[in-house]
Swiss-Prot record:
Main location: cytoplasm
Organism of derivation: Geobacillus stearothermophilus (Bacillus stearothermophilus)
Pathway of action: Purine metabolism; AMP biosynthesis via salvage pathway; AMP from ADP: step 1/1
Family: Belongs to the adenylate kinase family.
EC numbers, comma separated: 2.7.4.3
Pfam families linked: ADK (PF00406), ADK_lid (PF05191)
Region annotation (NMP) ranges: 30-59
Name by which UniProt lists this protein: Adenylate kinase
Binding site for Zn(2+): 130, 133, 150, 153
Chain segments carrying region LID: 126-163
Job description of the protein: Catalyzes the reversible transfer of the terminal phosphate group between ATP and AMP. Plays an important role in cellular energy homeostasis and in adenine nucleotide metabolism.
GO biological process, one term: AMP salvage
Catalytic activity line of the entry: AMP + ATP = 2 ADP
Length: 217
């Protein structure tokens, strides 16, 4: 079961990744984790990636693909994998397809957790944090008993600067522009499966299970 998981910030991708990994026993492979592991192991590609990252540069695709290849060749990926955060571009998607063919594998599905922008805005701008004790709330999913007041210590709740509407809208726009060509690419290839991410998280996972045939471990 070889999967790629896609979704904009706030779509609930992390939650669904955890559920897929628990149900199917395949490793959750994120770009950040891959880079950190390769650098820790001191592999030639890991050391190359570290040089770029230490300079604040983007890691070139050929290095990233090499690290992905090394990761997918490990024993825990023999029954499948869940790629998250990679590929990010059509060039990376094409390179991934070539690399998988080289090792005799191919993708089964690209799962796209689809949520409208207005719903994402609501989710991402709803976070509130207590100035006093740091407790986290959400205006929709975990509201305080009294608006603007922390349940735990009575402190004032505030919205972080990076959670305000202008910042969130810009982040979503950047991500949407980056992701749309990738969605189109995988749709043309026949791998893409859209899952309605506006439902309850258990219903979202039920839809994913149905797509994957409900074959839990």
């Amino acid at each position: 079961m070889n999967l790629v998981l896609m979704g904009l910030p706030g779509a609930g991708k992390g939650t669904q990744a955890e559920k897929i990994v628990a149900a199917y026993g395949i490793p959750h492979i994120s770009t950040g984790d891959m880079f950190r592991a390769a650098m820790k192991e001191g592999t030639p590609l890991g050391l190359q990636a570290k040089q770029y990252m230490d300079r604040g540069d983007l890691v070139p695709d050929e290095v990233t693909i090499g690290i992905v290849r090394e990761r997918l060749s490990k024993d825990d990926c023999q029954n499948g994998f869940l790629l998250d955060g990679f590929p990010r571009t059509v060039a990376q998607a094409e390179a991934l397809e070539t690399m998988l063919a080289d090792i005799g594998r191919k993708l089964d599905y690209v799962i796209h957790i689809d949520v409208r922008q207005d719903v994402l805005m609501e989710r991402l701008t709803g976070r509130r944090i207590c100035r006093n004790c740091g407790a986290t709330y959400h205006l929709i999913f975990h509201p305080p008993a009294k608006p603007g007041v922390c349940d735990k210590c009575g402190g004032e709740l505030y919205q972080r600067a990076d959670d305000n509407e202008a910042t969130v809208a810009n982040r979503l726009e950047v991500n949407m522009k980056q992701m749309k060509p990738l969605v189109d690419f995988y749709e043309q290839k026949g791998y893409l499966r859209n899952i309605n991410g506006e439902q309850d998280m258990e219903k979202v996972f039920a839809d994913i299970r149905e797509l994957l045939g409900g074959l839990a471990r």
